[in-house]
Amino acid sequence: MNRERMAWRAGYLLAAFGIYMVDQASKAWAVRALRFGQMKTLVSGLLDLEYAENRGIAFGQLQEGGAFGRWFFVVLAAAAAISVLVYFFRTPRSDDRVLGACSLLLAGILGNLTDRARLGYVIDFILLHAGSYHWPTFNVADASICAGALLLAYDLFRSPRSQVPSPKSTT
């Protein structure tokens, strides 16, 4: 890969690294500052902090896997990170929205992968709610993954589709 092509991609990768570092730092803070099961209210009726250990996948699903489940999710996350990187390096320079989405996805995947490989679980601590509805506890990596996925979905529906020419009539 030539120097110019790598230089502009480095900015996106640097952004991903920055988000990854914010995720890891925020989780380290949560471990030190929050007690398991204790809730700290930041914005009454909207935002709380509550330490949780997620041994499953999104929203705490599939937590019964034990050691097999831990390493299965590590391998799955590693495969997802590799897939995002391949897609990232195949995306044209002009496609900023997709490149940004890949950066967000990569940061989030690697943030949760690091926890799972190192600890056997993912540290979650952000709890949003409105009235009686509570969103499942999440972290910066989860928010990054959701933002990246939404950006990709937006791009999918906003990108112009190539027009297939209609068959010519031969009558």
For each predicted feature, which ranges?
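Alpha-helical transmembrane bundles and membrane-interface segments of multipass inner-membrane proteins
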Residues: 1-171
